[in-house]
Amino acid sequence: MKIGFIGAGKVGFSLGQFFVQGGLPVTGYYSRHRGSAQEAAAWTGTKQYESLESLVRASDALFLTVPDGAIASVFAQLREFDLAGKQICHCSGALT
């Protein structure tokens, strides 16, 4: 199962690093802050994706590691893509 991260802040960065160290296949990161995605990808030896769609296509599971306030808008964007067979997890929780 190939894992992709939407959001490359502290949670996405740390969780991706943990997964890679555990031998799980991480495809990489997409973030509205390109520099954060580049840094997380470099640190984990993965890829920084230029578009959300390319990350979705490359991944079987998607971790939303964005702030609570961004979950709804990110999910609205995700619904535009073929999500059949994909697992979507979010790592926020103050609101949900």
Predicted regions and their residues:
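NAD(P)+-binding Rossmann beta1-loop-alpha1 motif at the extreme N-terminus of oxidoreductases
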Residues: 1-50, 54
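Rossmann-like NAD(P)(H) cofactor-binding subdomain of soluble oxidoreductases
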Residues: 44, 49-96
